[in-house]
Amino acid sequence: MNRITIAKIILLIVFFTVFKDNSFNYEIDKIYPKLLILRFNNKKYMNDELGKISYRYEGLSILDGHNFPASFIKKSDRIYELVKKNNIEYVIGIYDSESFLHEKLHAKYYFNKKYKQKIDKEWNNMKVSKKNKIITFLKNLGYSDKVLIDEYQAYKYSEKDNFFNLD
């Protein structure tokens, strides 16, 4: 092999190593047909693509998974056309399977009125001291007031029993 061929091979290896993970796949959910699920190949690219939208919605941009109503997507966001074309109301984004349940629970809270009523009732009937501990915990994670109940239910049903350190 000559030097030019070796240089081309090295360049291709570097190119595919650097750029291979900057992609995502998408699917329309079968249970909630107005839900768009974005599956990213790496966390950094996911946060680069969805972080600004999540920040508009919940006050955080660097996350292990993203969820937001489509109304928070601007024309300048790269996923705008995909969302518009498919008449999407809600989006979740993940880069690994560990965060899928958590993000899907956000969609359930958004789409399933009975489930939302059940969670809201549970929250409203909770002892004030317990609720205040959960609020403090979630605010320390950086969540805004408007998503506290939604985050509470997603963590409660996707994490270990004592996730909120209430014991």
Task: Show where each model-derived region lies.
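Glycine-rich, acidic and aromatic/proline-enriched surface loops and short helix-turn segments
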Residues: Y110, K114, K160
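Short acidic alpha-helical/loop segments enriched in Asp/Glu that coordinate divalent cations
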Residues: K114-W123
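N-terminal Sec-pathway targeting helices
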Residues: M1-K8
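A metal-dependent hydrolase signature that marks the N-terminal structural subdomain at the beginning
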Residues: K8, L12-V91
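Short amphipathic alpha-helical segments that mediate assembly, nucleic-acid/protein binding
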Residues: I6, P33, M46, K75-I79, ...
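Active-site recognition of the HExxH zinc-binding catalytic motif
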Residues: E98-F111
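Metalloprotease/metallohydrolase-associated module, dominated by Zn2+-dependent proteases
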Residues: K84-V91, W123-D167
